[in-house]
């Protein structure tokens, strides 16, 4: 690849096929995949490149388009997968920590309030970005402070939960960010009670979601005063399919790659569902899955 990249301490990989790296098993090639070895390495890269910088986490809620991703794609690795207890029912976690691991760590520390995270695929960084939530709880309710690197100026910032301006499945920060660390706070509880709640969340998820299929979580956010899956179902979308992509019969707010679908199949099917709901209810569904790459 004939491009000039800053000299870093982390790892560059070139021409990476994203269909091998995403939960949906779709997507073209990323020009450059970069795993920084620490925050300083990450900030140095951003400050010393003119290439566009994108961010991926566990890739559990993204569609990478068939054309791939231009520029540099950052993925936090094991160096950002640390979890430690701070005392006073507080936990510090790096941006690459899986949310399920955070939930189990909290349980082992007898810290309650984070059990809902056990059923959410993805990382701390991704969960902070989208204010991930389930069963009436969300990241905003348990996060205390956040460290983030701005993708435009490359500087490190720290925000309180209030400064994030959280709302349903989003936040109010301007610009593009990569969330590298967060502090969470729960309440003390008995281990057996926490363990029971963890089991209940997992069982509920297993009963209602297509966990064994190639999916990327919920397609759409719930519109105000509606549930997305109900609108999709009542719009007659349950049997829709395009190419190798179809709507899950177990939970119709999930896309499935069931037969070698392309990214275009999945994105077009999602847009077809959007159009059907708009025509039936005059409600505009908003993607919860992130779509990366250009046409």
Curated annotation (Swiss-Prot):
GO terms for cellular component: cytosol. SUPFAM superfamilies: FAD-binding/transporter-associated domain-like, Uridine diphospho-N-Acetylenolpyruvylglucosamine reductase, MurB, C-terminal domain. This is UDP-N-acetylenolpyruvoylglucosamine reductase. Gene3D superfamilies: 3.30.465.10, UDP-N-acetylenolpyruvoylglucosamine reductase, C-terminal domain, Uridine Diphospho-n-acetylenolpyruvylglucosamine Reductase, domain 2. Belongs to the MurB family. It is found in: Cytoplasm. Transmembrane segments: none annotated. Its cofactor is FAD. Pathway: Cell wall biogenesis; peptidoglycan biosynthesis. Its main location: cytoplasm. GO terms for molecular function: FAD binding; UDP-N-acetylmuramate dehydrogenase activity. Cell wall formation. It catalyses: UDP-N-acetyl-alpha-D-muramate + NADP(+) = UDP-N-acetyl-3-O-(1-carboxyvinyl)-alpha-D-glucosamine + NADPH + H(+). The keyword Ion transport does not apply. It comes from Wolbachia pipientis wMel. HAMAP family: MurB. It comes from the Bacteria. The active site is at 169, 218 (proton donor), 288.
